[in-house]
Curated annotation (Swiss-Prot):
Binds to the 23S rRNA. One of its GO terms (molecular function) is rRNA binding. Keywords: Ribonucleoprotein, Ribosomal protein, RNA-binding, rRNA-binding. GO terms for cellular component: ribonucleoprotein complex; ribosome. It holds the Pfam family Ribosomal_L9_C. Belongs to the bacterial ribosomal protein bL9 family. This is Large ribosomal subunit protein bL9.
Amino acid sequence: MKVLLLEDVKNLGKAGEVCEVKDGYGNNFLIANKKAKLATNEVINKYKAEVKKKAETEALEKAQKLQMAETLQTVTLTIHKKVGANGSLFGAITKEEITERLKEHHANLNLDKKDIELKHPIKSTGIYEIEVKLGSGIVGVFKIDVVAE
């Protein structure tokens, strides 16, 4: 019997492959445990269409993330904070504060605080480059200008 593997099966094949197996193994193990489907033309064509649609969706999402990374490069946030006599801030600028400011000034950039990478806490005035992990290995960078009030 021919089956279309829905997931990787050790010593048999990878997901998406059509394999020839014995009837008992196919029916009692692979199909029963939803690791494979009976390989008819309809099932194979449907699987290929799903894979193609998934690839198109991933390509579209990656293009959107690249566009967001380009947009982020043009962003410079200015944050006003109280400063002590030695030039250091009272407290540090947090990821949460950065995401709130981004949402205020750039509503189209929808980022979560866990996406922001701070190499070290921001505790003094100056210009800092902030990295944002957008997924799919894409990293965006924008600048923050910390100014004394």
